[in-house]
A protein has these predicted regions:
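N-terminal secretory targeting modules
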Residues: 1-53, 59, 63, 67-68, ...
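Extracellular glycan-modifying ectodomains
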Residues: 44, 93, 110, 126-135, ...
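Structural recognition of the beta-strand scaffold that forms the well-ordered cores
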Residues: 51-54, 74-78, 102-107, 140-145, ...
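Oxyanion-hole/transition-state-stabilizing segment in secreted/luminal serine hydrolases
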Residues: 59-75, 84-122, 142, 146-150
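Cell-envelope and extracellular/periplasmic
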Residues: 78-80, 104-117, 126, 133, ...
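Sec-exported extracytoplasmic/periplasmic mature domains
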Residues: 92, 96-99, 108, 130-137, ...
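Charged helix-capping and loop-helix junction motifs
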Residues: 118-128, 158-163
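Catalytic His-Asp segment of secreted/periplasmic serine-dependent ester chemistry enzymes
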Residues: 148-222
Length: 222
C-alpha cells in the first residue's frame, strides 16, 4: 500500500510539473502541423503497435525513416523547432491514438537553445515519460540522445549534461532506453564534421542520417 501511494505521489508531482510548464508555453504555433497529422490519420491511419518517432526537426526531416527500417512499421510525428514539452502536450493527439509499442524521442536541443538549463530539459524529459506511461504503461520509451552541431557547438557541454542525466535515469527505469548519438557527428579532433550536415550546419544531411540510422537500428530490431 505504501509503495502504491508513493508511486502515485511521484506520478502526481510529475503531472503537476507538466501542467505548470504548459501554462507558460505557446503551443498554438504547432496547431497547423498537428492538425495536418490528424487529417492524414483519417485517410491513412498508422497501424497500432508501430514504432513512433517524435521530436524536433531531426525527426521531422528524417525522410528516409521507412527505408532505413524496412522490416518495421514506423510512424514519423516530428515537428521542427519543437521542445520536449511540445511532444508531451500533444501526446494525446499524436502518440496515444496509435498505441505504439515503442516511442523514440529526439528533442532537447531547441530547449537549450531557447535558454533552458540542462536540469530543466531533463525535468521535461521525465514529465514526457510520466505522461506517456500514464496512458501507455507498457510502451517502451527510447531517448535518442542529443548530439552536437557546428551551428550550436557552444551548447555541447549542456547537451552532454542532459545525456548524462537521462543515462542515470534509464538505469533505474527499465522501460526507458537510451541511444548514445553524441559521438556520431564528431571527427578524430573531437569537432563536428561538416560533411554530415546540410548548409545550415545544424541539421543532418543524407550521410548524417545514415549514421543516425545505424545507431538506432539495434533498438528497432529488439
Amino acid at each position: 500500500m505504501k509503495s502504491f501511494t508513493l508511486a502515485g505521489l511521484v506520478l502526481l508531482i510529475a503531472l503537476r510539473s507538466v501542467f505548470c510548464a504548459e501554462t507558460n508555453h505557446n503551443f498554438g504555433k504547432w496547431e497547423k502541423e498537428i492538425s495536418a497529422y490528424e487529417a492524414s490519420d483519417k485517410t491513412n491511419h498508422p497501424p497500432k503497435g508501430a514504432l513512433l518517432f517524435i521530436g524536433s526537426s531531426t525527426v521531422r526531416l528524417w525522410k528516409s525513416l521507412p527505408q532505413d527500417f524496412p522490416n518495421a512499421k514506423v510512424v514519423n510525428r516530428g515537428f521542427g523547432g519543437s521542445q520536449i514539452v511540445d511532444s508531451t502536450h500533444f501526446a494525446k493527439r499524436v502518440i496515444f491514438p496509435y498505441k505504439p509499442s515503442k516511442v523514440f524521442l529526439r528533442a532537447g536541443g531547441n530547449d537549450l537553445w531557447q535558454g533552458k538549463s540542462a536540469e530543466e530539459v531533463f525535468s521535461d524529459f521525465r514529465d514526457f515519460v510520466a505522461r506517456v506511461h500514464e496512458k501507455l504503461p507498457k510502451t517502451e520509451i527510447v531517448f535518442i540522445s542529443l548530439s552536437p552541431s557546428i551551428a550550436r557547438w557552444k551548447q555541447a557541454d549542456k547537451e552532454k549534461a542532459v545525456n548524462t542525466m537521462v543515462q542515470e535515469f534509464v538505469k533505474k527505469n527499465p522501460e526507458v532506453k537510451y541511444i548514445d548519438t553524441y559521438p556520431l557527428p564528431l571527427g578524430s579532433d573531437g569537432q563536428p564534421r561538416p560533411e554530415v550536415f546540410v548548409a545550415d550546419k545544424l541539421h543532418f544531411n543524407a550521410e548524417g542520417y545514415k549514421l543516425l540510422a545505424e545507431c538506432v537500428r539495434p533498438f528497432v530490431q529488439k
